[in-house]
Each structure stands twice: as C-alpha cells, then as structure tokens.
Amino acid sequence: MSRLVVVSNRIAPPDNKGGAGGLAVGVLGALKAAGGLWFGWSGETGNEDEPLKKVTKGNITWASFNLSEQDYEDYYCQFSNAVLWPAFHYRLDLVQFQRPAWEGYMRVNALLADKLLPLIKENDIIWVHDYHLLPFASELRKRGVNNRIGFFLHIPFPTPEIFNALPPHDELLEQLCDFDLLGFQTENDRLAFLDSLSSQTRVTTRSGKQHIAWGKDFQTEVYPIGIEPDEIALQAAGPLPPKLAQLKAELKNVKNIFSVERLDYSKGLPERFLAYEALLENYPQHRGKIRYTQIAPTSRGEVQAYQDIRHQLETEAGRINGKYGQLGWTPLYYLNQHFDRKLLMKIFRYSDVGLVTPLRDGMNLVAKEFVAAQDPANPGVLVLSQFAGAANELTSALIVNPYDRDDVAAALNRALTMPLAERISRHAEMLDVIVKNDINRWQERFIHDLKEVTPRSPERQQQNNVATFPKLA
C-alpha cells in the first residue's frame, strides 16, 4: 500500500486540542487511512539548517522546519500574501510585486524540496496544498522525483486577464504542469487555469480532463472541499455557556443576523456593513427588532491593507450605530477578536440568518458550517455570495451579488420573514449536499484519482527537466 506524504505551508501540530477544521481534518483522515508523513513549516523563524523536528503518533509522522527571518518575509509575507493572495482574489490593485520576494519564494520552495527529498520513499504519493507551493513539484522533479504528485488549490484561480498580469505568470504555469493531478474548488477555477495555460502555450486535451502542455502530462479535476457535518451538529447542539444562555434569553424577541470570518479584504466586510445599513433604511419595520453581529479577528495585521480595512470597519460600525441606534438597541455589533470554534457553532445554531458575502472565495466553509449547525426543525436562513465557491453547491441559499447592497438588503429582509416550511425545505436540501460531499469524500476522491495516475518515467522526466521559460532576471 502506498504511503501518503502531505506537504503544506503550515502543519497542524499533533497535540492540537482546538477543534481543527478544513485542511487539517481532511489531511488527518487521509493520513490515518494510508499512514505517512505531514511535512511543512513549523510557523517559527530561526535557523533553517537545524534538523527537522519529527513527531510520530501511530502511523503518522509530522516533520517541520523553521524559516529564516528573511525567507519568512520574502516567501510568506511579500510574495505568497502580498502578490499571490490578492491576485488570486482579483485584487491586482493590492499586488506589490518585488523581484527579491519572487526570488525568495522560489528559494524556499527549493529549500523545502531539499529537506523533503531524503524522506521520500519509492512508492509514496505526494499531496501538495495551496498557493505557497505552486513550484514545489517542479523542484522535486529537478531532483529526480518521479512519484505521483498532486496539488490542491484552496483559493480561487483567476482569469487570464488577472493571472497574466503577474510578472512570473509563465514560469508559474509551467511549474504547475509538473504536478500529475491539479485539483480546484470549482469548475470555474479549473477552466480559468486552462484558459491561462492556453494563452501561453499549446494545450492538448484528451478525455476532457487529461492534458499535455510543454510536453508534460497532467490531469485537472474539481474537488469541492467539505466539512464534518455530524461533528458540527454535535458541537452546536450541546448546552450553552451561561453567558450565551443569558444573552439568548435577553434577545428572545430579537432576530439575529450573524457573520464570522477573519479580517480580510476578500470577505467583503465593508460592503456587508453598507448592505445592512440599506436593510435598515429600506425596511424600517426591522429597526429595534434585529441585531447584526460581525466577528472578524485580525489576520496579517502587519500588512497595510489589513490595517486599512480594520479602521474602515470600526468607522462604519460607529457611524451606522450612531445613525440608527436607539436607547436599549444597538443595531450592529462588530467584534475584532477570536472566539473558540465550538462556541461559534452554538452561536450559528441560535442565529436566524447567516450572512456570508465574500467578494471572492475558493469555497467558504463558514457557509457549510452554518447550515450543518442548524436545528433541522427550526433552521436559520443562509444568505450567500454568488462569488463563493460554496454557491455552486448550496443553491438553496439566498444567493446574492455582494456588490449590490440593495440586493443583499432584499435577501436579508426575505430571510428574516421567511416562513418555517420554506426554511426547513431549503435547509434540508443544503444539508443533503453537505453530507454527501463531506470532508472525507473530498480527500478520498482526490487520493483515489492520484493513485490512478500513471507514474512518470525517468526518460520523460529527464525531458521535462529542461525549462521552457528563462527565469526572471
């Protein structure tokens, strides 16, 4: 049986007691089934030459490494998060391309390949995750690795007009073709990648999703990531902490609109605040009878764009509360702090509306978690952006354009007044999809397809080691 090697920018520590979600749950499920290695950055800066830190529990080994301060700045802060993240979320105006950062990004991917190489066994299959590691298969191929290597992109893939604006777009595209299997959240993302590829070179497609570009064979497929619906339902249904129980009792006659995500410009938070203001303005009958709570803990707080959005939200929340607030009623609660994930599941369950309106999102698991946390006999309503990957699956949500505040306001009004029978029907339809496409099915489908790939021959690999594009000067 093939061993599984998972490679990601960060690894979840084996002693992590906090409720893991998303990538960690799926990866651990796959590793437990096959046995293997999880390899990635420790999250710490220090001496890169130190030996790997290894921990083994059962049939899984965790191997982590430190990054130097310079590599952390170039690879992680300046290229991954100041170039790729904004570009892949359609925000070219926020891209800050610097050649030293690009060189650092490539340098760290090469360093990771050097560190992983001695750990790879002949029949291992390798599963690489996300935008931090786009060149990683290429670096392994240069070192003679012919194993099956798959890649899953958790964030959107932009259209050619966006992607080709990146100075190293040609190199990145060719490097991606060194993976055997490329997985995307949605069909739109998969097609955007192929469109970008076709704009740079000839692409031969066989059987729909098998391709050849630059003489390299690879496959593309869609794997929408899921959640653990049963676990979330269990967390949501447990007893309420005393403070939350008291708050629920105090607000028994108030309908609650709830949102939670990390503070990020891709999430559409300023637009969401303005849509809530439009609800209060266009549907004044709700004033004094609803409350919107937005939880948005700070992330990447050292980046100017994130500081700017935090200040903007603080200003907008104060302005809206000052304009519409009444004695005894505050219309908007904005909390810039972290909450325990299990507590959030309970808050989801007692919210009448889940408001999830990113401007662009690969999937958005919060939308799925909100549905899974509901009481099937009295569920809340999900208002969901058409630009979230989850909108392709959760078609029974109220789908909105987050750029149209009046559209979002109308959907909120509809959600707040929706009859119980319709709420139950919509929730049941969405929950059925979530259960069928849970996190375990996601990883099982990907691993199955990767195992079916024919390994690359050393002869073909030797041909592929010659890069078509020169490196950026």
From Swiss-Prot:
GO biological process: trehalose biosynthetic process
Pfam family, one: Glyco_transf_20
Keyword annotations of the record: Glycosyltransferase, Transferase
Residue positions binding D-glucose 6-phosphate: 10, 76, 130, 300
Gene3D superfamilies the UniProt entry points to: Glycogen Phosphorylase B
Source organism superkingdom: Bacteria
Pathway recorded for this protein: Glycan biosynthesis; trehalose biosynthesis
Region: Disordered, residue numbers: 454-473
Transferase listed as a keyword: yes
Feature type site, description Involved in alpha anomer selectivity: 85, 155
The EC number(s) this enzyme carries: 2.4.1.15
GO MF entries: alpha,alpha-trehalose-phosphate synthase (UDP-forming) activity
Keyword ATP-binding: no
Binding site for UDP-alpha-D-glucose: 21-22, 262, 267, 339, 365-369
InterPro entries according to UniProt: Glyco_trans_20, Trehalose_OtsA
Catalytic activity: D-glucose 6-phosphate + UDP-alpha-D-glucose = alpha,alpha-trehalose 6-phosphate + UDP + H(+)
NCBIfam families linked to this entry: PRK10117.1, trehalose_OtsA
Protein task: Probably involved in the osmoprotection via the biosynthesis of trehalose. Catalyzes the transfer of glucose from UDP-alpha-D-glucose (UDP-Glc) to D-glucose 6-phosphate (Glc-6-P) to form trehalose-6-phosphate. Acts with retention of the anomeric configuration of the UDP-sugar donor.
Complexes and interactors: Homotetramer.
Family: Belongs to the glycosyltransferase 20 family.
Protein name: Trehalose-6-phosphate synthase
Organism: Salmonella typhimurium (strain LT2 / SGSC1412 / ATCC 700720)
Record gene name: otsA
